[in-house]
Every structure is written in C-alpha cells, then in structure tokens.
Amino acid sequence: LSKLTVCLTSNTIITTPWKPTKEQLLAAAGKTVPDVIAPGLRILFCGINPGLYTAAVGHHFARPGNRFWPALFAAGFTDRLLSPFAERELLKSGYGVTNVVMRATATADQLTHEELRDGGKRLAAKVRRYKPAYLAVLGVGAYRAGWDRPKAVIGRQEEKIGETVVWVLPNPSGLNAHYQAKALAEMFSELKAAVDR
C-alpha cells in the first residue's frame, strides 16, 4: 500500500513530506483537513479554507509557495522553519491551525459569501469552546465577509469572541501578491509582540 492509501483508509496522519499527483489534486476538491487545536492555545491561526494541495496531503498551508510557515519562523513563533508535515509541533508552543471554511477549493474565490458567514459562525463556536487567547484570521477579505465587517483592516480588531482577542493578518497564499514575504513577516511579528506582552 502507498502512504496515501494508508492515510485515506486508516486516518493515519502522514508526517513524511510527499507531493500529490495531478489526479490526487483533482480528487481533493471538497475534502477537509483536520484542525491542529487544543484548549487554551496562545493563538489559533485561521486560514480561509484549504487549497487542493493542502487537502491532498492533509496538512495546513502545504502548497509550495505558501508563506505561512516562513512568516511564522521569521516572526519568531518557531525556532526553525517547520514543514507543513510537522504542523502538530505548533501545539507544543501553544499555537494551532483551523479554517473559516473547511472544504477545499482550487482558490478561495470559489467560496460563497454564505459559506464564509456560516464558517464565521462555526469558527466563533469553536473559539468559545477551545478559548484561545488570540484568534488570528489569515485573510482580511474572508474576515470582512465571514463576520460582516466590511471596513475591517489588518491588525487587532475591536471586538472579541468571548475573551479571545481577534487579530487579522494578510492571507499568506503565494497567490496574494499584495504582501511580499518581508511585509508579511513584519505583520506576523506585530501579533507576536502583542501576544508576548
């Protein structure tokens, strides 16, 4: 059996990096990726939704060119550049990962406003249950749509979810050309400084 077959049939989480085939990428549409979550995290990072590459391999922000893992490292959240396949190591430092919308698509543009709003409600319930100190939503457009905050900007938000502080960061996808790696790392560093206060 291949590693992929074992993963799909036994729910085993594969930690050895591998690259999906074109067929596996196409088959990943609509799939989900398990949350990396625990109660009382320092920060719960929240992507918009899994891309096809991420869903195919079963690990968050896995597509080559995604800047999430380099930004975490550059901002000092991790002591080394983690592979997406080592995502569970984040829990040791008090960090986790989830998504606003759980289903995988080729691009976030394929999500409807209803999906984002429903995802925002589901995420708020998850935050109330797990009680992270901070929720970092990675994508201002998704935050605006999911929480009906059309004028939201990057940074700390005025509202909280329960006692959880909400912070919005840019989408780290390589498809987001508005923010280069250095600017992204600086914005992640601002969150790190706030959490460490």
Regions inferred by a protein language model and the residue ranges of each:
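Short, solvent-exposed loop/turn segments at secondary-structure junctions
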Residues: 49-53, 102-105, 141-143, 173-175
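Short, hydrophobic/glycine-enriched beta-strand segments
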Residues: 37, 42-48
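Internal catalytic-core helix/loop-beta-alpha segment
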Residues: 96-146
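Short amphipathic alpha-helices and their capping/turn segments at secondary-structure boundaries
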Residues: 32-38, 81-90, 126
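Short glycine-/acidic-enriched loop or helix-start segments at secondary-structure transitions
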Residues: 54-57, 144-148, 178-179
